Curated annotation (Swiss-Prot):
Lineage: Eukaryota, Metazoa, Chordata, Craniata, Vertebrata
More details: This protein is produced by a polycistronic gene which also produces the tumor suppressor gene SCRIB from an overlapping reading frame.
Keywords: Translation regulation
Name of this chain's protein: SCRIB overlapping open reading frame protein
Biased composition (Pro residues): 1-13
Role: Represses translation of the downstream SCRIB protein. Translation of oSCRIB hinders SCRIB translation but does not completely abolish it, probably due to leaky scanning which allows the ribosome to bypass the weaker oSCRIB start codon and initiate translation at the stronger SCRIB start codon.
Region (Disordered): 1-30, 86-120
One Gene Ontology term from the biological process aspect of the record: negative regulation of translational initiation
Domain of life of the organism encoding this protein: Eukaryota
Amino acid sequence: MRTEPRPPAPSPPSAAAGARAAHPHHAQVHPAVALQPARGVGGQAALFAAGRAGGDLPLQPQPGGAAARRQPAARAAQAFFPAAELAQAGPERQRDPAVASRGGQLHAAGGAGRVPERYP
């Protein structure tokens, strides 16, 4: 009867290996924690939803923001189309060369006293 030599028994873990395993940076993370998205769109959306539910984030624009500094559309249109402004003014204002020469568009359309129907 022949006996084969047994493989050597595994050596006990060394003190250094035990110290490495005990270090918090080397500790294994639980799989449920490791699978959660730490960053990205999904994580941010969940964060914002949680903030809105708690009332941390505003749902409406706040006064004094960018919308409050913006010019109304009617005023912005007058800066580009002075004829609309002149059409609302009286005839004495329409004949004023200082007003009619703004941008040179009214002079090209026929002079200081004439307001064009529309721009080309």
